[in-house]
């Protein structure tokens, strides 16, 4: 089941390393849904959590945070 995740890269991540991460997303059968302007981050869609875990292992040195993209409600 495909899911969207918000992935934030570390501030000092070189553009070449960010490109390698994005290439890995595509290679894993995923896609880039959105690229953030203010921070070095992306919303990605991946086929399953296993693919996400492989991306996290491969690019652990540049990934700051990963969280599922879902609705947030306030009361």
UniProtKB/Swiss-Prot annotation:
Keyword Protein transport attributed: yes
Any one biological process term the GO annotation gives: protein transport
Localization: Cytoplasm
GO cellular component, one term: nucleus
Gene3D superfamilies (UniProt xref): Peptidase S8 propeptide/proteinase inhibitor I9
Entries under InterPro entries matching the protein: PBI_I9 (IPR052471), S8pro/Inhibitor_I9_sf (IPR037045)
Modified residues (Phosphothreonine): 74
An MF annotation (GO) of this entry: endopeptidase inhibitor activity
UniProt keyword terms in alphabetical order: Cytoplasm, Phosphoprotein, Protease inhibitor, Protein transport, Serine protease inhibitor, Transport
Domain of life: Eukaryota
The family this protein is said to belong to: Belongs to the protease inhibitor I9 family.
Purpose of the protein: Cytosolic inhibitor of vacuolar proteinase B (yscB), probably regulating protease B activity during limited proteolysis. PBI2 is a component of the LMA1 complex, which is involved in the facilitation of vesicle fusion such as homotypic vacuole and ER-derived COPII vesicle fusion with the Golgi.
Assembly: Part of the heterodimeric LMA1 complex together with the thioredoxin II/TRX2. LMA1 binds to the ATPase SEC18.
Remaining remarks: Originally, 2 inhibitors of protease B, inhibitor I(B)2 and inhibitor I(B)1, have been isolated from commercial baker's yeast, which consists of both S.cerevisiae and S.carlsbergensis. It has been shown that S.cerevisiae only produces inhibitor 2, and S.carlsbergensis only produces inhibitor 1. A sequence for inhibitor 1 from S.carlsbergensis has been determined (AC P0CT05).
Name of protein: Protease B inhibitor 2
Taxonomic source organism: Saccharomyces cerevisiae (strain ATCC 204508 / S288c) (Baker's yeast)
Source taxonomy: Eukaryota, Fungi, Dikarya, Ascomycota, Saccharomycotina
Gene from which this protein is expressed: PBI2
């Amino acid at each position: 089941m495909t899911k969207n995740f918000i992935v934030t890269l570390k501030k000092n991540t070189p553009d070449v390393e960010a490109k390698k991460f994005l290439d890995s997303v595509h290679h894993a059968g995923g896609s880039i849904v959105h690229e953030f302007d203010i921070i070095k981050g992306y919303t990605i869609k991946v086929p399953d959590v296993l693919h996400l875990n492989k991306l996290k292992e491969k690019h652990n040195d540049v990934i700051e945070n990963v969280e599922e993209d879902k609705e947030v409600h306030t009361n």
